[in-house]
């Protein structure tokens, strides 16, 4: 019997890149900075800089708060598509 589930390894590099790419797109579209986003999302102007720097660590709960903040902000700026 073969194992039907395949696990894709998600690395630290992957999660760093995913957030930074998303943050860059948001910052450009909304003419804002990583510092301003960090303050608004998690009360830390340096958070995204730490995520961006592979030599520095970050808290996964803070990472999740940042993702949730981006989710909420993106919903606010999306054009009305629901009908």
What are the functions of these language-model segments?
Residues 35-36, 48-49, 61, 73-77:
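Catalytic phosphate/metal-binding cores of nucleic-acid and nucleotide-processing enzymes, i.e., regions
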Residues 26-29, 54:
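Histidine kinase transmitter module recognition
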Residues 31-47:
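Short alpha-helical DNA-recognition segment
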Residues 2-27:
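A short, Lys/Arg-rich alpha-helix, primarily the initiator
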Residues 23, 27, 41, 66-70:
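Amphipathic alpha-helical interface segments used for dimerization/assembly
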Residues 47-67:
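Short, basic-rich loop-to-helix N-cap that marks the start of a DNA-contacting helix
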Residues 6, 12, 74-83:
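Short, charged recognition helix plus adjacent turn
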